[in-house]
Swiss-Prot record:
This is UPF0502 protein YceH. The keyword Acetylation applies. The modification N6-acetyllysine is found at K80. It comes from Escherichia coli O127:H6 (strain E2348/69 / EPEC). Gene3D superfamilies: Winged helix-like DNA-binding domain superfamily/Winged helix DNA-binding domain. Keywords: Acetylation.
Length: 215
């Protein structure tokens, strides 16, 4: 995988991809615009608090690596930045609108289930149903120039597996939960419920005894 983004680089690129689609009238972004986007409290996981100098350093590095380019033409006294990460004129990475929406949401929020991705990516692309989300994820996971996402083992107690992007390197994938561990969890839950019932019965008997003594 030739893409190796740090967490801050992934946040910067994710923000530019997002704003290119959701607020095209404000795109490309100035340094201040990128700082604000990176530090948003909504649709970000984790929430970051990057300084202007930290963001500027990421922008400079990404420009050198040809993932971004500066825009400072006539009438633009402030340098602005636009992404060349995907779908640029001379770039190799070509993604559909659906793929851009999923990749952007993964860059901004980390590992997520298909259901979470569908709802969170809705401002960028309206998926017709869950089948379209899952088929797009599978395409990203099996592309010849990829893979760009990976399906993680399902977590205990969760109905859906999560997916994660691979633009920051390989993802540590925990082993799938075995039936034995599920059985152990079920046994523990049953024991806890039995103890709760026993405590409730003891409390009821104590209340009854205290009421009797009061008489």
């Amino acid at each position: 995988m030739k893409y190796q983004l740090t967490a801050m680089e992934a946040r910067v690129i994710g923000c530019l991809l997002e704003k290119q689609v959701t607020t095209p009238e404000q795109y490309p972004l100035s340094v201040n615009g990128v700082v604000t986007a990176c530090n948003q409290k909504t649709n970000r996981e984790p929430v970051m608090n990057l300084s202007e100098s930290e963001v500027q350093e990421q922008l400079d590095n990404l420009v050198k690596r040809h993932y971004l380019r500066t825009v400072s033409g006539f009438g633009n006294r402030v340098t602005k930045y636009e992404q060349r990460f995907c779908n640029s004129e001379f770039g190799d990475l070509k993604l559909s609108a659906a793929e851009v929406a999923l990749i952007t949401t993964l860059l901004l929020r980390g590992a997520q289930t298909p259901g979470e991705l569908r709802s969170r990516a809705a401002r960028m692309y309206e998926f017709s149903d869950m089948a379209e989300v899952e088929s797009t994820l599978e395409q990203l996971a099996s592309r010849e120039d990829g893979p760009f996402v990976v399906r993680l083992a399902r977590e205990p107690g969760k109905r859906e597996s999560r997916y994660m992007h691979l633009f920051s390197g390989e993802v540590e994938n925990p082993p799938a939960v075995t039936d034995m561990s599920n059985a152990a969890d079920g046994d523990l839950q049953a024991r806890v419920e039995a103890l709760e019932i026993e405590v409730a019965e003891l409390k009821q008997r104590l209340d009854s005894l205290l009421a009797h003594l009061g008489d």
